[in-house]
Amino acid sequence: MALRLSVSSSHGPASSPAISTCRPAACGRFPALLGGGVASQRRSLTVVSGPETRAVIPVRSSGSDTATVGAEAEAVAVTGQVTEVNKDTFWPIVKSAGPKVVVLDMYTQWCGPCKVMAPKFQEMSEKDQDVVFLKLDCNQDNKSLAKELGIKVVPTFKILKDGKVVKEVTGAKLDELIQAIETVKSS
């Protein structure tokens, strides 16, 4: 499920299309959709999920080609897709998942086994609508969260229930991961 984003400005109508799509956790930065180069324009981002508006969020822009959504953005656990998280969005999304099982794929861009598992993890997310699938790039920016979660190798899959890590699978072991998820779901 994608969210429809509409950006508006108090400085008049947009000169380029005002609608884009973005995954919830990836919406921290998105292409600026308004024309003009006025520094620090006040804009708003309307998040629409299904037939109704979910939120109107203030957006700051410094005249570059990107805008940053403020901290007011709501973290939403989404099923049916893999959502990219970071050190700031992970725990709020886990909390919003409530009693649902959450599976976190901790990977790096350069890891061969991680690249092999990525499409399989995506396929799992599309098939299992009862589980929230997340992925975390264990880069320098997310080092603090990776350390907090105790990662030693990549890929590492953390399975959480009620906000707590209850199982872990290390390595590109698809069958073991599927079994671990089923075990946690049935407990």
UniProtKB/Swiss-Prot annotation:
Transit peptide, start-end: 1-72
Record keywords, A-Z: Chloroplast, Disulfide bond, Electron transport, Plastid, Redox-active center, Transit peptide, Transport
Site (Deprotonates C-terminal active site Cys) location in chain: D105
CDD domains: TRX_family (cd02947)
Subcellular location(s) of the protein: Plastid, Chloroplast
GO CC, alphabetical: chloroplast
Active site per database record: C111, C114
All copies of domain Thioredoxin, residue ranges: 73-186
Disulfide pairings: C111-C114
Site (Contributes to redox potential value): G112, P113
Major location category of this protein: plastid
A Pfam match: Thioredoxin
Signal sequence annotation: none
Entries under InterPro entries matching the protein: Thioredoxin-like_sf (IPR036249), Thioredoxin_CS (IPR017937), Thioredoxin_domain (IPR013766)
Function (record text): Thiol-disulfide oxidoreductase involved in the redox regulation of enzymes of both reductive pentose phosphate pathway (Calvin-Benson cycle) and oxidative pentose phosphate pathway.
UniProt record similarity statement: Belongs to the thioredoxin family. Plant F-type subfamily.
Protein name as catalogued: Thioredoxin F, chloroplastic
Gene source species: Oryza sativa subsp. japonica
Lineage start: Eukaryota, Viridiplantae, Streptophyta, Embryophyta, Tracheophyta
